[in-house]
């Protein structure tokens, strides 16, 4: 019986274990996790979501404090059009985040950074160019373009000396989205090095409408592979979303995928950036505790735990400190939803905002618990301890279970021994 380790992801002469850990922000798929996955021979991701916040937390910088200080007089205003990021500070934060991660890298694997187009930051084109360029400057192995069509993203970095050297790929949820990307970038004569096909069971933002349940990953992967074949294009396809066991992964590799991208099972590893108390919430979750909603100001549906503390929280918008989802006109759907509730409840000290959430603040504080569809199965991958909590796993344990397991089985690690 075949297993994941019987396959290899090939980039030219380079061969890797065909396991990619998806990019999860804010700092959930963190440097520690990415470095460990690279050591094991796969591809780890870091995320550039709220990179200045991540830099402050990990590297003792003070970008957020300085931005808030600069725009503090604007805090009470609903008009955020004048609140801008310093491109120089974005670049510096990216160099910290990417550079330090790459310095720590060991082993034969690779480390990519996940870049969301929907992080519009009140200057979509300039801030995205800065993030992409800084990542390349800092030595990242590859970039995965996510949360958007990215029709112009290659063009932003076409003059960079590493444009044809670094591995560049895109996440799509349909052959149509891929076709649009390829047509738009045909003039550059630079194909993506890989395509991640993300299905409807993925965690966080989804590339589907609220009819997501009508789609399935296997069908979309087959359609994308067929499309590439019809266009005589040899681009590795990476299947993602709802791949919970090594046998699940092997099925996609046998179907023709070059690799799989997984994430949910790594959220409860010791290396993952989530606080341990949140990891326990993931373990405890039942299938009924998980929902897909429209709370994200990005406009994309989002999968999360219903018990996320950020749901319904009516905090004042924190755009002066954060503001990563401000569009090109300084607007954000949460600001509108918040202002509407304030108007409805004049004089109230607190309001509840149920339509949208202040994603920047709550993701920074780990109060929106984004998750994959199969999060409710995590409790079956480990042991419950005497105190009722669940034993955390190591990234190596989870990675190697994907790599070597067969017959739909999950190798539960040995129970931890209590220290007297």
Where is each model-derived feature located?
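Active-site entrance/lid segments in N-terminal catalytic domains of soluble metabolic enzymes
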Residues: 1-231, 400-419
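Conserved active-site-proximal phosphate/metal-binding subdomains
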Residues: 20, 202-217, 221, 225-238, ...
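Residue-level detector of alpha-helix initiation sites
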Residues: 28, 243-244
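A structural signal for short, well-ordered beta-strand segments and their strand-loop junctions
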Residues: 45, 144, 238-239, 261
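Short, surface-exposed recognition loops or helix-turn segments adjacent to catalytic cores
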Residues: 153, 239-240
């Amino acid at each position: 019986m075949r297993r994941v380790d019987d396959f290899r992801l090939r980039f030219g002469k380079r061969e890797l274990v065909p396991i990619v850990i998806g990019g999860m922000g804010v700092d959930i798929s963190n440097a520690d996790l990415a470095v460990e996955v690279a050591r094991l021979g796969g591809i780890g991701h870091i995320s550039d979501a709220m990179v200045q916040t991540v830099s402050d937390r990990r590297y003792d910088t003070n970008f957020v404090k300085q931005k808030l200080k600069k725009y503090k007089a604007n805090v009470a205003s609903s008009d955020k059009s004048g609140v801008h990021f310093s491109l120089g500070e974005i670049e510096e934060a990216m160099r910290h985040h990417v550079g330090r991660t790459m310095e720590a890298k060991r082993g034969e694997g690779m480390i990519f950074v996940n870049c969301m187009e929907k992080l519009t930051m009140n200057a979509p084109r300039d801030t995205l160019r800065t993030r992409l360029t800084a990542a390349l400057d800092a030595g990242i192995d590859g970039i995965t373009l996510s949360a958007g069509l990215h029709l112009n993203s290659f063009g932003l970095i076409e003059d960079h000396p590493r444009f044809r050297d670094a591995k560049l790929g895109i996440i799509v949820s349909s052959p149509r989205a891929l076709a649009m990307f390829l047509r738009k970038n045909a003039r550059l004569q630079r194909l993506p090095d890989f395509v991640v096909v993300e299905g409807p069971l993925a965690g966080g933002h989804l590339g589907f409408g609220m009819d997501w349940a009508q789609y399935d990953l296997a069908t979309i992967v087959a359609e994308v592979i067929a499309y590439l074949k019809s266009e005589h294009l040899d681009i590795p396809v990476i299947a993602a979303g709802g791949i919970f066991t090594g046998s699940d992964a092997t099925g996609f590799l046998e179907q023709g995928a070059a690799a799989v991208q997984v994430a949910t099972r790594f959220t409860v590893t010791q290396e993952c950036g989530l606080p341990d108390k949140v990891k326990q919430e993931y373990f405890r979750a039942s299938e009924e505790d998980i929902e897909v909603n429209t709370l994200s100001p990005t406009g994309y549906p989002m999968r999360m735990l219903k018990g996320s503390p950020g749901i319904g929280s009516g905090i004042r918008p924190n755009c002066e400190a954060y503001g990563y989802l401000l569009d090109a006109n300084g607007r954000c759907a949460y600001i509108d939803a918040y202002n509407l509730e304030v108007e409805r409840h004049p004089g109230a000290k607190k309001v509840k905002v149920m339509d949208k959430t202040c994603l920047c603040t709550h993701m920074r504080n780990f109060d929106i618990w984004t998750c994959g569809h199969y999060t409710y199965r995590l409790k079956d991958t480990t042991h419950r301890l005497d105190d009722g909590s669940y034993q955390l796993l190591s990234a190596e344990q989870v990675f190697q279970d994907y790599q070597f397991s067969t017959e739909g089985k999950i190798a539960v690690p040995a129970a931890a021994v209590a220290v007297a």
